[in-house]
Amino acid sequence: MTANITFKEYLKSFFYILEPFNRYRKTYENFFHVMSCVSKQKFPINAILKNGEKKVLKNYYETYLTSFQIMNDYRIDGTVISISKSDMPKTKIDFGNNNGDIYAVFFEEIYKFLPVQDQIIIDIGANIGDSSIYFSIRGAKKVIALEPLPKNHSLAESNIKNNHLENKIDLFLGGCSNSNGHIFVDPEKEGAGSSTNHSNQKLKVPLKTLDTILKENNFEPTLLKLDCEGCEYDTILSSSEETLKNFSHIQIEYHYGYKNLKQKLESCGFDVSVTKPNFIRNKQAGKTMFFGYIFAKRL
C-alpha cells in the first residue's frame, strides 16, 4: 500500500487526521460542541465564532464552509446550495446526502489548473455534477461526464438541468477502466468513496476504456479530469501513449499513492507535479487511502 508513496510521505500523511480538528478550532470558540454535533448529525448547531459572533448552523455543509471562513457568496435551502460569487454565474447545486465537494470545486477552485476556456473536457467521476458544472461556467465548450453510481448520476442530471447546461454537458451512467465491460453496483450507494465492486444488488453499469470514450465521440477532447476513487490506476496505466497524448492537460485525484501514475505520465511526455499524500480511512469504501492531486501538462 505504501510502495506508491515514499516512507517519509507515508509518515507525514497521518498529520492530515488533525486537519479538521485544527480548522474547527481556529474557527469556532465552542469547537468541541460543534464537532460533537457534526459527528452525531445533530442540527441546527448554535455556534460561537472566534470573533464572538453567534451563528446558527443549519446543516453539515454550512458548518463545513464556515470552518473555511466562507460566510458569504452562498445560501443553503434544505439540500440545495445557491452560489453567488461575483466572478461566476449564479449556480444551484443539490448536494443530496452531503455529496460532491462544493468547497473544493467552487470556492477553492481546485480545478483551475485545467484551461477549460473553449475546450472539450472528459470528466470521469462526475459525482453530483459539481465539477462538470464548474467546467461549463468557466467556459468549457463541451463536457463529457461519466458517473457510475445511479444516485449520484440522478443528482448530476438534475443539477445540470437546473443550471440550464444540458447543451454543454453530456452525462453518462458509467465508469472508466482498463477494459470494456460492466460492473454491478448497489443502487443505494452514493457519495465519494463508495465502492463500485461487485454487489449483491444487480444493477449493471457499463465500463469503458479511455480509448473507447475517445473513439465514441465525434470531437477531440483536449483535457481530462479523473476523480473516480481508484479507477485512475486502471484507466491511466492501461492507456497507450497515443491515447494519453490526446490531452494537453490531465488532473487526477489519486487515492492510493501517485508514483506509478506519475512515472507513466512522464514516460508519455508530460510534465508532472503532485500534492503531498494525505491519509484517510474511508468508511464507505472500507479502505485506507492516501490521496492527493496530480497535475500533468503535455510537453
Model-found features: residue ranges?
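Phosphate/nucleotide-binding beta-alpha loop and adjacent structural elements of enzyme active sites
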Residues: M1-L299
